[in-house]
Amino acid sequence: QINSHTQGRYLDEEFFDPIFRALVEVDQPLYIHPATSPDSMIGPMLEAGLDGAVFGFGVETGMHLLRLITIGIFDKYPTLQIMVGHMGEALPYWLYRLDYMHQAGVRSQRYERMKPLKKTIAEYLKTNVLVTNSGVAWEPAIKFCQQVMGEDRVMYAMDYPYQYVPQEV
């Protein structure tokens, strides 16, 4: 497990590549856990009370996973598995738009780091990403995520002690 960014640095930097090599060598997944957003993105959330678990954690961690996918981490390491909580930090619900706009961005050549991938973002979520429902004990969301990613990609987890709802068990 790693707490998302490290002092504002993300795992898509080449500096962190040995972590991924080691994970693939020992066939172990990486769990990216939310952390407080870095200073560069927390300001507008903090002043509105949207930092932390209410919104900020998910946005920051979802962005981190998306940065890894779009840099081609799963093209470089096809067997790598990455886990995130909170129903995939909302990425499963954005898949159509993520795929569409990523492909449009690649075609436009507007962003230097946005390159073609071997698969769609949706395909990577179905083969290389595992999610837990921690903090999201809401049946419609769980069923949607299972439908989009596959039942074998969605795991149960309780966000204890931060969110404890005995009925969800």
Predicted regions and their residues:
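Inter-helical turn/loop segments and adjacent helix faces that build the functional surface
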Residues: Y10, K76-I82
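Active-site gating/metal-coordination segments in enzymes
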Residues: Q1-G72
